[in-house]
Swiss-Prot record:
Residues 23-52 are annotated as: Disordered. Residues 1-15 form the signal peptide. It is found in: Secreted. This is Putative uncharacterized protein DDB_G0286451. It comes from the Eukaryota. It comes from Dictyostelium discoideum (Social amoeba). The lineage of its organism: Eukaryota, Amoebozoa, Evosea, Eumycetozoa, Dictyostelia.
């Protein structure tokens, strides 16, 4: 019974951390929307190739495991 309680507590803590982190990421993205809109002309000069280039500060929590392969950007699947 105690083992089940410990597992439930761990799952709840992980879920809370993910929710808090996703909220902080969405807030930081909202604050940078105006700067992204002003840079649309720059992205069009580059052929729009910078759509999936995210700064390291905007990487979602627990999704930074793609460091072994720099050509594989997992963030492209989480931020459209």
């Amino acid at each position: 019974m105690e083992v089940i309680v410990v597992i439930v507590v761990i799952v709840v803590v992980i879920a809370i951390v993910i929710v808090i982190d996703s909220n902080s990421n969405s807030n930081s993205n909202n604050s940078s929307d105006s700067s992204n809109e002003s840079n649309n002309s720059d992205s069009s000069k580059n052929g729009g190739s910078d759509i999936y280039q995210f700064s390291s500060s905007n990487k979602p929590f627990l999704h930074n495991f793609s460091n072994n392969n720099p050509n594989y950007n997992i963030n492209a699947y989480f931020r459209i």
